[in-house]
Amino acid sequence: MAIASGSWVATVNHHANPHSFTSPTKPIFFLSQKPHNFHVCSSRCSMVLEEDEKKSPSPKEDKWPFFEPGPNDLNRVLSRFLRDPETRKLSSEFYEKAKENSELRTTKHLISYLVSSKSWDLLVSVCEDLREHKALPDGQTCSNLIRSCIRDRKFRITHCLLSVFRSDKSLAVSASDAAMKGFNKLQMYSSTIQVFDRLKQSVGVEPSPGCYCRIMEAHEKIGENHKVVELFQEFKSQRLSFLAKESGSIYTIVCSSLAKSGRAFEALEVLEEMKDKGIPESSELYSMLIRAFAEAREVVITEKLFKEAGGKKLLKDPEMCLKVVLMYVREGNMETTLEVVAAMRKAELKVTDCILCAIVNGFSKQRGFAEAVKVYEWAMKEECEAGQVTYAIAINAYCRLEKYNKAEMLFDEMVKKGFDKCVVAYSNIMDMYGKTRRLSDAVRLMAKMKQRGCKPNIWIYNSLIDMHGRAMDLRRAEKIWKEMKRAKVLPDKVSYTSMISAYNRSKELERCVELYQEFRMNRGKIDRAMAGIMVGVFSKTSRIDELMRLLQDMKVEGTRLDARLYSSALNALRDAGLNSQIRWLQESFDAAQTSTSKYSNTKNTGTLS
């Protein structure tokens, strides 16, 4: 028998077959017949241990087990004992004791060496030889070997080794379990299914709970939920131990598959079955069930499961809490959303920005901006951390309530926290500057926005055009208009209306007509705001034909006239003496639609007569 390590060189001298092996790194151990001489050479000592053949056992008793070398301490102790003549006999006995380790240790080290040296084909050959001699290693070694092959992407070797290990029932199960787990990690679910099918084809081999867990996980990942349920029924029929560590995962997977198949109530029955059998529930199981019932808007069941999970300290999924919050928002139970936040805080679960913005936005739409602001301030007192979207909603609420100082303070706080590229927040602040006639602040904000790498959108351009148009600063408005087009931001209806309105105030009516024609060429749809401006423009410029075309387009597009617009158009036609056009206008836009004044109706009737 030869032993070699980093500091050992061992030589075995046999009467017929001398063996020697040296390795600077890894030890390899071979089984040989009884040695006559055993020479130990070490960097620390060089001694010879002579065995007395008279005391050697008979051939019948010559059973040398496999040897597992001890740690470096064993080398040091043996060397020290061999130096002293008085302890040489003791060292021999100590060495014999060391050889009495498990008989499979040598196989483990040989396999470990072949794996580390990447000798895959030789590894398969060794395992086949071990099968021939019925000396396969234990289940743990086989499982580690399979995991190593999959980790190094040696899938052909993996399947070859699995075929070798299937000769032993216990090894077949443990090795297949390790293989399926490895394939699932690599998302090779078809390979997992293949391994499970071959395992079931083996005679007298029953898959373990772990094998069922891996195969159910694979089918769930590829969307075969019906197959998961079938395997679960098969698992229960096998009467395997429900107290296995994989049982909780198995029940979680089947509940998830049932919920995804729209069978949430059956999943709830499976949960009750778990409780009856004493299988501990997991946070993933509760999360999946709560999400399923929240999406189905089953409020009572969702509340029950949510409270149950909170009582068992299994609230660990913020996404599930978001589903519950959205359910309450859709149902209009806004106050209950605050209870969800309180439960999350109690469970030390972070309240995400998605949850906060859903709550604040829900209050804003259903209860008004004042309530939304109160909820936001309450959340901040609860030490919830707002994100970019929540900040934007709160800033908009403050602006709508005309609390401009708070809106600006909140915007500054938002920028300091690093949320300096939120276009919606910039738009709200820009609109606020326009309403408060702070044109210079708006221009500075635009410059900062560009400096921070945030591109202005159509809302910001519209706000700037509108505020400069109202201030009669047409040069600045035209500059912004051209900049918007250079940035390839297409003008919308509001953009054109603001520009036309600005030029109308400055009495540049021809420019108004040019912009209107450009708007119509771009297939813009007329609204009452633009129609009101253009009726006045066409009337002032005596463009009666274009006025009639405008009114006809409005009728075709279904745009309704208000009293002011109706009166303006009617007066323009009357001044031009176009009675037939007046009659058409009255027939096309009746008094019920326009809600015109009694004075206008009376005056128009007198004109027709």
Swiss-Prot record:
Subcellular location: Plastid, Chloroplast
Domain of life the protein comes from: Eukaryota
Each PPR repeat, start to end: 103-137, 138-168, 172-207, 208-242, 247-281, 282-316, 317-351, 352-386, 387-421, 422-456, 457-491, 492-526, 527-561
UniProt-recorded Gene Ontology molecular function terms: mRNA binding
Subcellular location, principal: plastid
Transit peptide: 1-44
Keywords assigned by UniProt, alphabetized: Chloroplast, Plastid, Repeat, Transit peptide
Record keyword Chloroplast present: yes
GO cellular component labels: chloroplast
GO biological process, one term: chloroplast organization
Family: Belongs to the PPR family. P subfamily.
This protein's name: Pentatricopeptide repeat-containing protein At5g13770, chloroplastic
Organism: Arabidopsis thaliana (Mouse-ear cress)
